Amino acid sequence: MKFGLFFLNFMNSKRSSDQVIEEMLDTAHYVDQLKFDTLAVYENHFSNNGVVGAPLTVAGFLLGMTKNAKVASLNHVITTHHPVRVAEEACLLDQMSEGRFAFGFSDCEKSADMRFFNRPTDSQFQLFSECHKIINDAFTTGYCHPNNDFYSFPKISVNPHAFTEGGPAQFVNATSKEVVEWAAKLGLPLVFRWDDSNAQRKEYAGLYHEVAQAHGVDVSQVRHKLTLLVNQNVDGEAARAEARVYLEEFVRESYSNTDFEQKMGELLSENAIGTYEESTQAARVAIECCGAADLLMSFESMEDKAQQRAVIDVVNANIVKYHS
């Protein structure tokens, strides 16, 4: 198993955008000296639940300030971007970092974002699929020549061509059954989301294997990723209380049609939150539910930076001890 960090970069009344970004950069610099494999950046628009609307831009900065870790977009929303521009930027990052960039992408999860960016909501998945085909063609061949309902233009060279043979490593967020089925047919790794339940993760993992098998796709070497929030404290209730404050605005906005206490309880129990024993057991169960090969963690809900570093150090020591 490989381990990394992901950054949600939530704002709230105690955290301004400049503070959030500074904390991300500080943490990235610190963990780059440790044994973590990947740093991934979350994309969000028009709310406090993430201040980064351009994860490839942030990835470029992180690649420039780090030497060891891979850097990834966690969920670059390709449905609301022009695919050629996405491919150009991703290949440029791949070239300039000599292969340290990974391309994590997603369909758009918010219909309001689709409308704002003037994208067709009635054919969203078809657009998502066509965007990825253009990007993937650019990654694998250096060229693209689409002729579909959304994009049609002569064959072009997407410059620079990728440094990595076949293009940057790719993974897609498991945002719906439709996306999971699509990914399985292509043998693309999934990202299981931290705010999905274990039951949802297990369902998606089972669906992926079922569809892959039905289409003769060998997924034995596919490395799915799981994202989890981490908040450890010798006082488990203190860890849960702190994480609850961190998540409250997100839950109220993103799950407005769901019972608040039920969803909050699910997040607190099915992420790595509590004492060391409670959090490691929760992580173990989540990994077993989805069969992920890689784990990405966010430590951002921990306000005390000394405590946050101490927990990161413990994880790093376990990586050295058990996974080197």
UniProtKB/Swiss-Prot annotation:
| PROSITE patterns registered for this protein in UniProt | BACTERIAL_LUCIFERASE
* Gene Ontology biological process terms in this record: bioluminescence
Q: Which domain of life is it from?
A: Bacteria
Q: Please give the Gene3D superfamilies that the UniProt record associates with this protein.
A: Luciferase-like domain
Reactions catalysed, semicolon-separated, are: a long-chain fatty aldehyde + FMNH2 + O2 = a long-chain fatty acid + hnu + FMN + H2O + 2 H(+)
UniProt keywords (A-Z) are: Flavoprotein, FMN, Luminescence, Monooxygenase, Oxidoreductase, Photoprotein
Q: What is its EC number?
A: 1.14.14.3
Main enzyme class:
oxidoreductase
GO MF terms, alphabetically ordered: alkanal monooxygenase (FMN-linked) activity
Segments passing through the bilayer: none
Return the SUPFAM superfamilies for the record: Bacterial luciferase-like
PANTHER family hit by this protein:
BLR5498 PROTEIN (PTHR30137:SF8), LUCIFERASE-LIKE MONOOXYGENASE (PTHR30137)
User: So what does this one do?
Assistant: Light-emitting reaction in luminous bacteria. The specific role of the beta subunit is unknown, but it is absolutely required for bioluminescence activity.
Family affiliation? Belongs to the bacterial luciferase oxidoreductase family.
Q: What is this protein called?
A: Alkanal monooxygenase beta chain
The species this protein was found in: Vibrio harveyi
Question: What gene name is given for the protein in this entry?
Answer: luxB
